[in-house]
Structure formats: structure tokens, C-alpha cells
Amino acid sequence: MSNQEVDFQAAHLESPMKMSPSKVSMNHGAFMANMQNGYSPTREGATAGSSSTRVIEALHAQIDSLTKTNLDLTVQSNNLLSRLESSNNTQSKHLESISTLKHENDNLGLMLSRKERRVRDLEQQLSQLKHSYEEAAMDNKTMRHQLQTSGQREGTLENQLQQLQVQYDALVDGQKRYREKYDLEVEELKKSLQDFKRDNEMYLTKNIQTVVSNNTALQTKINQYSGKYKNLESLSQQHMQELSREVEGMASKLDLAKWEKLYEESRNMAIEYSEKTNVPLSPSFLAQHGAKSGSRSPSTSSSSTFVHPSQIRVPKVRHSSSSAKRSSFYGSNVSVPGGTVPGVKQPSASPTTPSSGGLPGVRRSSSVRGSSSSSRNSSGDLASAESAAQSQKGASKNSANNKKKRMSSHSYSKSNGFSFGEP
């Protein structure tokens, strides 16, 4: 054999072909059967030629050695293939186990992460529980203190309750006694009230006729008095109207400007007399009449010395001249007082002036008509003193008549035995 063939076979021996274990086992079974039977394909052709016997035998020896080597290698290969197959199975199992373990490892990693999160959550819960425990411990301590305080207060309240119970029992007993006492008093008052009602009914029954008769008589007297009062009121109105007409008529006949001129002259004469004789005038005279003023206008004097018509008495001499009036005013039997001027308020007393009646022909009257003063004009409408005196006399007569009527009615009621009190 050449070296190439040996190298080729050695290469084939060094790197056997990859065969499946099933095919190797089938060829290996046939080869092993031929080897056991002593069958060799080269031995059949050895008889053909004697010259190449040695070469053939050498080749047969090599073939046998190679066959043996092949057989050993086949056995070894078979063993290796079986081992490879078992290794492949083991590897596949290991791969499966590795994948399973990887999956389990992933699962365990996820579980570990979940457990770690759970641990962190539990740690937070533990911290919260610790905080809650501390708060609960503080609350428990506070509650214990409050419990002790409440126990002490409960004891105090129990003592107070016992005291109040004793006081309440005493009040109930006192109320019961008072109730019994007041029930008896109420019963007595009811009996007294019933007796009083019965006596009052008897009294009213006895005196009802007297009350009715007195009421009838009283109503009759009231009606009579109303009629008399109406008649008296109508008469009074008529009298006042008549007086008003008379006063207006007398005031229309009076010359006010002449009386003002007389007043100015008399006042100036009194002041001149006091200056000539050095006799001081009274302060009341000066306060009422003032100083000497001959240049006063009639309008000013009339406004400042306005006299009510009822305060002036006109002299009885009619149609006389101013000289006659002046002579009668300055007569020897007439004195000029300082404080009796018409229309001016009179003082109480004057030490330097005589207390005569006033100016001649003028007399004060107590009856004053307020309604007639509003109807006077600035031309000097003043009433006469005679009308004022007549009105005063008429008013006094009416008042006297009214008094007589009242006295007669009062005496009549007394004579009849009628009274306004209880019968």
C-alpha cells in the first residue's frame, strides 16, 4: 500500500465519520458475525497466485490488525456513541433543568421582589404600629389618669348624691305636710267662698229692687239736669252775644285819640310838678309811664297804651266839648294818681301818690272779654264802662241764679232721700 492510502485510512481512523447509533449497531452486528465465523474475503483469492502470497499475507495481517483496530475503534465508538447519546440525553435534561431553574429563578426573583416590597410595607406598618402603640400607650396612660380622676369624682358625686337624696327625702316630707296643710286651707277657703256666695246672693236678692229704683230715679234726675244744663247754656250764649253787641256799640262811640292826648298831658303835668316841687316820683310810676315825652305820635301812644274795652268807664255827660272834659278832669275834688292809667298794669301801692280811684270818668272792671278784643281795629274801638258793669252785674246774677238752682236741686234730692252711695 502506498503512503497516501495509509494516510487516508489513518485520517479516517483519526476522524471517524459521524454515524447515527442505529446504523452503526446494524453494520456492527454483521461484521462481528463474519469475524466469529473466520470469514475473510482475501483468503479466497490467495490460491490464485503464489508470487504475491507474501504480500497478500502481509496485507491480510495488516487488514486483520486494522480490522481488529477497527473493531476496537468500533467498540470504542459504540461506547462513545452510547456515552454521547447518554450525554446528549443528560444535556437535554440539563438544559431542561436549566430552563426550569431559570424560570424558577425568575419566579423566585419576582417572589423575592414581592417579598422585599412586602417587607418594606411591613416595616412601614411596623413603624406605624409602633407609633400607634406609643399613642395608645399615651392614651392608656391618660385614660388611667382620667379613670382615677373619674373614680375620685364618682366617689364625691356619690357622697353628694346621698346628701341630695337625704335633702330630697326631707323636701318630699315637707312638701307632703305642706300639701296636707294647704289642702285643708283650700277646703276651708272653698267653704268660706261658698258661704260668701250664698250670703251675697241673698243680699243681692234682697236689695235688687232698691238698686233698680235708685237707678231709675238717678236716670230721671240726670235727664232733668241735662235739660236744665242745655237751657242754661243756650241762655248764656244769648247773653254773651247781647253783651258783645252792646260792647261793640259803646266802643264805636268812644273817641280814643282824645283819651290818649289826655293821658300824655296828665303824665307830663305829673312829671313837671315833681320837678318843680322836688318831689321824687315812685320807681313803679317811672317804670310804667316812663319820662316826659311831649312829641310822641298818636299812633305810637295808641299802640303802647291800648286799653281793653271792659276796663274803661265813659262819663255820663254826652256831647260835651274837650274843654268841659278837661275841666272835669282837673277839678279840685279829683287827684291824679301815679299808677291808675287805662291799659297799664296797676302797682300794689305807691308811697308818694294818693290811692284814689283813677282818672275821672274811668273805672277798672274785673270782667274781661277776650273774644271781643280780637274784633277791635286800630281806630280805637273800645267798649264803655257802663256796658262792662252791666255785663258784670248780669254775670253775677246768672251765677247767683245758678247757685240757687243747684242748691234747690241738691236740697230736693236730700228731701227725697236719694243718695249715690250704697243702699
UniProtKB/Swiss-Prot annotation:
Bilayer disposition of the protein: Peripheral membrane protein
Gene Ontology cellular component annotations, sorted alphabetically: endoplasmic reticulum membrane
Keyword RNA-binding: yes
GO biological process: one example: mRNA transport
Signal peptide (residue range): none
Biased composition, class Low complexity, residue ranges: 293-304, 320-332, 347-380, 391-401
UniProt similarity note: Belongs to the SHE3 family.
Role noted for this protein: RNA-binding protein that binds specific mRNAs including the ASH1 mRNA, coding for a repressor of the HO endonuclease. Part of the mRNA localization machinery that restricts accumulation of certain proteins to the bud and in the daughter cell. Required for the delivery of cortical endoplasmic reticulum into the emerging bud.
Name the record gives this protein: SWI5-dependent HO expression protein 3
Organism from which the protein derives: Lachancea thermotolerans (strain ATCC 56472 / CBS 6340 / NRRL Y-8284) (Yeast)
Organism classification: Eukaryota, Fungi, Dikarya, Ascomycota, Saccharomycotina
Gene encoding the protein: SHE3
